[in-house]
């Protein structure tokens, strides 16, 4: 039997296409009427009494006070709690079969974000085949990730896992010499009970390279939660203050940098306490997006002390009770929990900076946490953030004309559904349903509040939110509602297109730059692409006829 071996993922530079899967034949059965579908009085069949009680709590503050949770108390939290109470009639949990990628796919973007890292996925051939298809690279690229392939001798415990992993890590150190090695656990390591967390501290001492263990396996609800697992593990690694790689060249950690702010904006003891606060943003986005969001906050007098993850592992920020943290993506609830429980950080509850409306409120909530009022425009009397939001929407009129009055249906794939639905509602679309693999109503309280507010402002019904949707029943609802656009995973795209349903791959929103003010056009370009294709096709048919 062969021992555990290091298998580099090298493949041809080709593109993968969605498989034309069968959906069990043609559509059958009748769907519920639309008036019943949007009924506010429909019972919540998927929520238990304990889930209903917990949804009324203002995030983690009341429920887990003993765990050291703390949260910035703004009006949005009260509004968010009230909104969640009202959302019970719109929320449903089907616990059905749905399709998504494996969370180990987070390696695709994290190894590029953390430039001095090396990701080692510990799994079977199935994991390797998936990564080879999902992470296609050219043969001379030498990617900073590899596959530690488990074979029969490893699973039957005939080999010493520690010795084999040590041999591989020494080989990685010799070949690449990274600043950190990230072990990605898989379903197999869970089943055979590999003690990765127990081996990592001992091994990193021997080889002199920190090792972060992240169990990003198929037990999660969505593939984007793999990033959540890795960032949560890195947040725990930042607690090792005695480790040299956490200290920069100046000998100071990022959290020791004071927030630069004029004394005129704060007064008294509270002002001195605010001056000690530092801001750390967590979420993996491209470096151009981090620069844009950092500059947006700097315009309002707020300096970002650090990002999780950082481009270099040695710049990983440390966290303490004086650290304010705010999320970038809606699938990072585990990271937020770790930062609050283990690091005693304070979480700023805010919508996510997706779309100009979400970005504006996101910046406003951060400003409120630091006691800063957003700058005003002396001509209009509005805040500069509000004027900029309106200016961006005015510049998108060519896209908005195509979207107004159109309907969209989210089948659920990457946990970005609520933020995208809120933005598309603001653009004039009608959202029939928001399918989402997993919804943390506490972490997304502000996003849910903004969604409800946007629906009221646009005078459209609140969409039904279906957690863990059953794809079979979703397809029946799609047939009944006939949406103009269905945002779905790759597994269903081709079969739905074959049945005359316009689709868009949800995974494209994961890899596109959709955060901040400047990337709004990128979102609308993705959304309108299939609609414009249909429009051109219809025009061609009419011209021929």
UniProtKB/Swiss-Prot annotation:
Residues the entry annotates as binding [4Fe-4S] cluster: 102, 127, 187
InterPro entries named in the record: LIPOR_BchN/ChlN (IPR050293), Nase/OxRdtase_comp1 (IPR000510), Protochl_reductN (IPR005970)
Superkingdom of the source species: Eukaryota
Cofactor: how bound: Binds 1 [4Fe-4S] cluster per heterodimer. The cluster is bound at the heterodimer interface by residues from both subunits.
Cofactor: [4Fe-4S] cluster
Pathway per the UniProt entry: Porphyrin-containing compound metabolism; chlorophyll biosynthesis (light-independent)
Any GO MF annotation of the entry: oxidoreductase activity, acting on iron-sulfur proteins as donors
UniProt-annotated location(s): Plastid, Chloroplast
Entry's Gene Ontology cellular component terms: chloroplast
Presence of the UniProt keyword Iron in the record: yes
SUPFAM superfamilies: Helical backbone' metal receptor
Keywords: 4Fe-4S, ATP-binding, Chlorophyll biosynthesis, Chloroplast, Iron, Iron-sulfur, Metal-binding, Nucleotide-binding, Oxidoreductase, Photosynthesis, Plastid
Family: Belongs to the BchN/ChlN family.
Primary role: Component of the dark-operative protochlorophyllide reductase (DPOR) that uses Mg-ATP and reduced ferredoxin to reduce ring D of protochlorophyllide (Pchlide) to form chlorophyllide a (Chlide). This reaction is light-independent. The NB-protein (ChlN-ChlB) is the catalytic component of the complex.
Subunit structure: Protochlorophyllide reductase is composed of three subunits; ChlL, ChlN and ChlB. Forms a heterotetramer of two ChlB and two ChlN subunits.
Protein name: Light-independent protochlorophyllide reductase subunit N
